[in-house]
């Protein structure tokens, strides 16, 4: 029997309307090469399950610490999770005994069939709204083999496909998605290599080159610019971003407002 591909996913949101046209199902992939301080989904960064703790929901029962097989959780003097130890855990029993749902585990394995089954549930809404699937994360291209197979299956089913991407992967990986992506939602965070690396750990030249190559290959692109105070909001950088987008002949730009939704995570 052929071995099934496994992808690490931390959320699947149906009836989404903000990441691509129409009504969409957003599939959130684990794993990202960048470490943006303002990331709205920090639980996406590691390519394996990781704990999420919500202090507001915690009732202080201590069951999680008592159950933890890695001795990774301490509740006194403050609630602390040793993530390095937690990464060795295979059971994540701590979350299963948390009745208040203050402790959850972000990420679990899915097969392509499992994801596709969920995506297809809203097929009738895709047809009436020009919607479909949006893969996001994290950076979905990190899991290239699983991603391409999922996209291929969606195209075979007549489902429109979009990807929200930071472009922080090799061109060899990104180009494999070209036959199966209808629209790329590309982040353009900064054009200065020193500043981008300092704030995200990313290689600006690689990111910008990948976007340019997508444009040169005829990809449909929406450039998305997250406005981060003190990072890319000065006049010189805004103009530089604008010149880059114009040089790629990308006709559409979306400005994303700054937020701190990732802070509680």
Where are these regions (language model features)?
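Iron-sulfur (Fe-S) cluster-binding modules
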Residues: 1-5, 248
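FAD-binding FR-type
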Residues: 85, 108-114
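Iron-sulfur cluster-binding cysteine motifs and their immediate structural context
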Residues: 37-44, 63-81, 91-108
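Conserved AdoMet/S-adenosylmethionine-binding subsite of the radical SAM
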Residues: 113-261
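Short loop/turn motifs at secondary-structure junctions
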Residues: 35, 69, 94, 99, ...
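Short, solvent-exposed beta-strand edge segments and adjacent coil->beta transition regions
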Residues: 22-24, 78, 100, 130-132, ...
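Short helix/strand-capping connector loops at secondary-structure junctions
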Residues: 264-265
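N-terminal pre-triad scaffold of radical SAM enzymes
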Residues: 9-63, 79-88
């Amino acid at each position: 029997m052929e071995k099934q591909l496994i992808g690490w996913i931390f959320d699947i949101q149906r009836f989404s309307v903000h990441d691509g046209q129409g009504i969409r199902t957003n599939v959130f992939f684990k794993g990202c090469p960048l470490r943006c301080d303002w990331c709205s989904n920090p639980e996406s960064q590691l390519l394996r399950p990781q704990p999420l703790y919500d202090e507001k929901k915690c009732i202080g029962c201590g069951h999680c610490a008592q159950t933890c097989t890695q001795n990774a959780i301490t509740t006194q003097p403050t609630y602390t999770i040793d993530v390095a130890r937690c990464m060795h855990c295979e059971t994540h029993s701590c979350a299963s005994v948390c009745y208040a749902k203050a402790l959850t585990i972000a990420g679990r394995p899915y097969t392509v069939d499992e994801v596709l089954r969920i995506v297809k549930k809203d097929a009738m809404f895709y047809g009436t709204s020009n919607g479909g699937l949006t893969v996001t994360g994290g950076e979905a291209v990190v899991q290239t083999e699983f991603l391409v197979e999922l996209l291929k299956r969606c195209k075979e089913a007549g489902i429109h496909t979009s990807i929200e991407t930071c472009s922080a992967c090799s061109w060899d990986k990104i180009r494999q998605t070209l036959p199966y992506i209808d629209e790329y939602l590309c982040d353009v965070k900064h054009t200065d290599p020193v500043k981008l690396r300092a704030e995200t750990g990313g290689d600006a030249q690689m990111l910008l080159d990948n976007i340019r190559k997508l444009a040169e290959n005829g990809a449909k692109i929406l450039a998305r610019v997250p406005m981060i105070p003190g990072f890319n909001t000065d006049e010189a950088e805004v103009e530089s971003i604008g010149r880059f987008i114009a040089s790629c002949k990308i006709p559409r730009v979306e400005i994303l407002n700054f937020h701190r939704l990732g802070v509680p995570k």
